[in-house]
Amino acid sequence: PLAIEVIRRRLEDRGGGLARVGGQLRLVEGMALAREEDEFKLTFYNTLTCWIAIDPLLALFGLDRAALADADRVAAAVRTLAARMPTYVTLKDVKKRWGNGQEDIFPVLQWEKLWGDMTTLPEADTLFFSVPRPRGQQLKEQAQLDGWLRDGSAAYIENLCAWE
């Protein structure tokens, strides 16, 4: 039910990518890799663009369209499938600003389930296809904007839209 767009990976791309694990092609998060440098061995990077066939996806959850009206059944199905997927625990710094230029920083644990980990499920029948970098490039920090503008990616996106 899933088709995921990937791009050729560049050195500055962070966060994992496409890998073969136990004979199965799937997305692997950078934080799930045993060694940080293993990320540089990955050839393709996730664009975060996913095409979904609704009825097969619902079937993966043990649901159909009619079942969507039953909130309790949907919640139970989501919890059951989520229990089969990895959970990541990350430490984040949360800032609380107060007064004039004052702030406190609190360490916070964040539990995450990631959509890309649906590809860990063999019955998800996931396909991957390579797209041009301008179509799927992720920008994760401001420092990437200059390169994005210079390499033609910004112009590519601009030409997709009618700006008024």
Residue ranges with predicted function:
Residues 1-164:
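Catalytic core of tubulin tyrosine ligase-like
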